[in-house]
Amino acid sequence: MADLTSRETSPSPDHVDETMLIRRAPREVKVVPYDPAWPQRFREEAERLRAVFERELIYIHHIGSTAVPGLAAKPIIDILPVVRNIDRVDCLNGAMVELGYEPMGEHGLSGRRYFHRRYCRDGAEYHTHHVHVYESGSPMIDRHLAFRDYLRAYPDVARRYAALKQELAHLFPYDIESYMDGKNAFVKVTEHAALAWWQRVLVVVLSGPVGVGKSAVANEVSDSLSSAGVPHALIDFDALTQCYPHLPGDRFGNGIGYANLAGVWRNARSCGARCLVIARVVETREELDGLRDVVPGADIVVVRLAASLPVLAERVRMRERGHGLEWHLRRAAELARALEQAAIEDCLVQTDGHAVPEVAREIIERVMRPALPGDLASMLT
């Protein structure tokens, strides 16, 4: 079982079925050294689960102690599928049974669907896989991912946790309740620290006039982060505003844009994203309020991309055609002057004479490496 479920609580009375009437063998509490084969066991099982969940599946995580390299654990693979609609998971119970799982409903945690695979040998019960299904946006996803990633980022904490589990397994080899109770205080303290740490999200806003290359640079930054393994989301805000009609008085569609951003970020966060790169024009600090509503408590850094007016005009001509060209040329010049006068950026990056990869590298080195949490910054090469 993943560490944050505390214990396998009994289902509510309306979930009782005949399988609960069978006297169960005692569960052996066995904590073993980390096995490098665990990630592969997860990947193999994830492939089987993908075939079951199909279009309902958004992402699938390896969670719990077996997902933390070097951490001693009970040899149980904990898996967290993120789905679009939790209620539709009930229709998949038959397919899960065919994979050898026992459907347990919510099993004491509202909004969850829980399945386990187990067997009995020599009078003892052994679990091999636990599957905890949640709908995208569930706070329980944050709890599981925060706890896992915190232990990955802080090996000293993971070592203390391993020592505690090994001691408890020795004291209570066939008493899972006492084993879980013994972990409870450590888990609560660590979870509190992990969630505070998890909430530290870096949001990098790439601002600048029309034609300066915001989207191209944002894509290059995202490619670099992806290559380094940094979990993040990339969003072009203008694409989220493309809805007609706009709310009267909302000329640029910020209302629908922020509503769409909230949905996209919710899904990205449930997939494990810990950083947001967003391309959009920001003319005032007040325009960032909607972003703060979507990502509360985030560290927001505004990067203004700048270019000389002749270079800007050349770039606009390269990308715009037809009757809209003259408007975009005027708008680019207006925005360039307005953004320079407002000077609300935290970092100014001149783009004249620099290729897109060079600009992206400057942003990563000047902005992201210093501002990202240490475990993510260390991934950047």
Predicted region positions:
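Conserved phosphate-donor/acceptor-positioning beta-strand/loop module used by diverse small-molecule
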Residues: 281, 297-317
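Conserved substrate/cofactor phosphate-moiety recognition/catalytic segment
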Residues: 219-263
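Metal-dependent nucleotidyltransferase catalytic core
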Residues: 34-49, 83-118
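Conserved lysine of the Walker
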Residues: 214
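Helical scaffold of the NTase/Pol beta-like nucleotidyltransferase catalytic core
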Residues: 2-61, 196
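Active-site nucleotide-donor binding segment shared across nucleotidyl transfer reactions
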Residues: 48-90
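Glycine-rich phosphate-binding loop used to anchor ATP phosphates in small-molecule kinases
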Residues: 256-296
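Small-molecule kinase domains that catalyze NTP-dependent phosphoryl transfer to phosphate-bearing small molecules
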Residues: 321-365, 369-381
